[in-house]
């Protein structure tokens, strides 16, 4: 599906943002591994999260939808042998966290995914899990899906420092460590998003976290999990597209309610404020251990910034849309130390730069990042290939709304991976000036 967008738009609206993808994934996983029945309200019915549901159904979890809630009857970490390959679709979260979970099960299972997921590296997860006693076989290409996993009942505890901060790798190790024979210690620098730790603590897991010698340290003891009642807040990674839309379009304001404000996820807000963005946060409260609140963003004159390397894990999913904001800012923006972008759904350094250049932006590739010389006057309508990367498709669409003329986004249907009704909301709420 290709989408044409007529530019010079503005938006003044309260926007309903989809539920958080990270928490939706983990709610299914924790519910499936817990004792009792977990109820999930506001679940994100997007392709990635549906892949997680389908995989856990194949592993014996009873999952049904009742009155707009997802009901999960837990298996108490005793999953069933799957009779089919576990198809993870496009979801790296599903794959990598499942590798940790399946490491605790005394059976073999095969994980596979689509052509994009098959290119993403998996040894970063399998190597530490192998140290704990699980076995892995790459069936076609080294380091890539499909993978055969053979778990073990009594895994060895691990003391492991992540070479690169990653919520997915960290979470896989935590899920495995819950069934190890003693205390495991996992460290990372800087700290990545901590939804797994918070949600598992809520479910009764014996997990302690602290900062030690600059590192974020997690201690995990063997634990059973209890069922939860979860209300999933709105996803700040999805909200970021409409926040930036309001900032770069004239006479615009966006209000987003019940949005997750976990400090490990709000890097995009902090950096946009450094750039001069008019953003207000209000109505802050705690739900299931997570900060949530209302975000209001208004048209702003932005300036370029140098992004601190310690903020990269907090904005790793938002870098394409941050780059769009940078293209409209006065001056130079540098985003570096972001090698993780190379192994996302696309090489997001290359695809983000190509997107910006197709709209006329001046930008340069760094070894592990981007340099963007902002100038609203240089920007014009363009044609952009999404490379089937949902965040590239949506970032390009936001940029298209703020420039003169008609732009075309190729293969735009991939937005549904995380934001099923993105174009309906974007074109419904924004109007031609």
From Swiss-Prot:
Subcellular location: Cytoplasm
Keywords: Amino-acid biosynthesis, Aromatic amino acid biosynthesis, Cytoplasm, Transferase
Residues that coordinate or bind phosphoenolpyruvate: 21, 92, 120, 168, 348, 391
Organism whose genome encodes this protein: Caldicellulosiruptor saccharolyticus (strain ATCC 43494 / DSM 8903 / Tp8T 6331)
Catalytic function, reaction form: 3-phosphoshikimate + phosphoenolpyruvate = 5-O-(1-carboxyvinyl)-3-phosphoshikimate + phosphate
List of residues binding 3-phosphoshikimate: 21-22, 26, 166, 168, 317, 344
The protein's name: 3-phosphoshikimate 1-carboxyvinyltransferase
GO biological process per UniProt: amino acid biosynthetic process; aromatic amino acid family biosynthetic process; chorismate biosynthetic process
Similarity comment: family membership: Belongs to the EPSP synthase family.
Pathway(s) it belongs to: Metabolic intermediate biosynthesis; chorismate biosynthesis; chorismate from D-erythrose 4-phosphate and phosphoenolpyruvate: step 6/7
């Amino acid at each position: 599906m290709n989408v044409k967008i007529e530019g010079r738009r503005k938006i003044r609206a309260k926007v309903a943002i989809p539920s958080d993808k990270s928490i939706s994934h983990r709610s299914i996983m924790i519910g499936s591994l817990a004792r009792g029945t977990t109820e999930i309200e506001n679940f994100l019915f997007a392709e990635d999260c549906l892949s997680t549901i389908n995989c856990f159904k194949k592993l014996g979890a009873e999952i049904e939808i009742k009155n707009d809630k997802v009901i999960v009857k837990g298996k108490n970490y005793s999953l069933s042998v799957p009779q089919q390959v576990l198809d993870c679709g496009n979801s790296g979260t599903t794959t990598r966290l499942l590798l940790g979970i399946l490491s605790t099960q005394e059976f073999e299972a095969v994980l596979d995914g689509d052509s994009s997921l098959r290119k993403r590296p998996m040894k970063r997860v399998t190597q530490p899990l192998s140290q704990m006693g699980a076995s892995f076989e790459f069936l076609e290409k080294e380091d890539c899906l499909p993978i055969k996993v053979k778990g073990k009942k009594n895994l060895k505890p691990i003391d492991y420092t992540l070479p690169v901060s990653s919520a997915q790798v960290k979470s896989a190790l935590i899920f495995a460590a819950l069934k190890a024979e003693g205390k495991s210690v996992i460290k990372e620098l800087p700290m990545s998003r901590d939804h797994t730790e918070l949600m598992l603590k809520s479910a009764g897991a014996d997990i302690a976290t602290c900062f030690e010698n600059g590192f974020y340290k997690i201690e995990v003891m063997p634990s059973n999990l209890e069922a939860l009642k979860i209300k999933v807040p709105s996803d700040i990674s999805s909200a970021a597209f409409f926040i930036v839309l309001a900032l770069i379009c004239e006479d615009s304001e966006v209000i987003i309610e019940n949005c997750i404000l976990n400090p490990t996820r709000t890097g995009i807000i902090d950096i946009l404020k450094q750039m001069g963005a008019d953003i207000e946060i209000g109505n802050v409260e705690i739900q299931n251990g997570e900060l949530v609140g209302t975000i209001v963003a208004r048209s702003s004159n932005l300036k370029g910034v140098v992004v601190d390397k310690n903020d990269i894990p907090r904005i790793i999913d938002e870098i394409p849309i941050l780059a769009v904001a940078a293209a409209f800012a006065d001056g130079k923006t540098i985003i570096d130390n972001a090698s993780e972008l190379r192994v996302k759904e696309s090489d997001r350094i290359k695809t983000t730069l190509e997107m910006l250049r197709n709209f006329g932006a001046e930008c340069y590739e760094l070894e592990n990042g981007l340099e963007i010389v902002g100038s609203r006057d240089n920007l014009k309508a363009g044609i952009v290939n999404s490379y089937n990367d949902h965040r590239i498709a949506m970032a390009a669409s936001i940029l298209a709304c703020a420039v003169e003329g008609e732009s075309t986004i190729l293969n735009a249907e991939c937005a549904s991976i995380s934001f099923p009704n993105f174009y309906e909301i974007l074109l419904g709420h924004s109007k031609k000036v």
